[in-house]
Amino acid sequence: MSLDHKHDGDATAAPTGLPVSGAVCKTGAPMSLWSTSHPAAAAAELERCAEARHDPGWAQAARADPETRYLISRATMHLIRREPPTQIAFLGSEHPLIAALDPSRQVLLGWFEGRRCVLADLPADTEPSVPGASFEELRSLVPLLPEGQAQLLVYARALLVWRSRQRHCGVCGAPTAPRNAGHLLACTNASCGAEFFPRIDPAIIVLVSDGPRALLGRQRSWAPGRYSALAGFVEAGESLEDAVVREVDEETGTKVSWVRYFASQPWPFPASLMLGFHAHAHETPVQLDGELEDARWFELEQLRSADEALLPPPYTIARRLIESWIQERTGEQP
């Protein structure tokens, strides 16, 4: 089961004890696009404050706080200022757009850069007048935004997609309504009461090596000449390691062992969590099954000297897998 993981070849100190209408937000570890022992560039801290989601007065507390920042989204697009530097066009709680927005269309994201941050999910026909700002898609923004803001939009987009796809109960078909500050959708049918949480689709992405070479593939939809690490969704009842072995075999006919976890990256297009691995190939002939347009072995020097047209973009876990393999073979920093 191939995954077009769409990597185009292909995701400050926190406040201490910030209150949410009586709730207390505890500090946590810095968050970024990466979850790994080898982090990417340092990101601004996001504290999700899960305990604050249970406060029924959270939306009113956010409105009453002049420091609250609202991340404005419509469908899956986000309000952005392009004037250098490119950044999220946050609005304050005093903005008329916020005052008119139903609380059911708001989601508490947590605290970002020491300030409360709320996702405002605008109706499709809303056209806010914010000078110098426009709605843009996340995919084009990831390489342009500061690391922390890119991570925040990844988080917001995942919630937006889930909310748009879970408007009705999957058990009885009744409408759903948000709870837990927007992080839970509950069936409104009292005799049903099913609850739904944000969906995450785990997918493996793996850099296969036989020692001196690395195996990369390409999909037909990618830019000409671009190759990337192999990827696919994890199936029901399957371990991550088994998914790596199966996907590589299905897509290329290559047998692998020695599967080693590397890092993870959220990729909300629409709801993937990319789990990166290295694997060693002990049978190397490539036999395509039709899921990929091509797959081939690349020598170390080919990848060391490759231009950007060949490699996946720098912000993707696919690129980091390739760079980590080069570093392991040569000792060079990417």
PLM region descriptions:
Residues L108, L119, H168, A186, ...:
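Conserved hydrophobic/aromatic beta-strand scaffold that supports enzyme active sites
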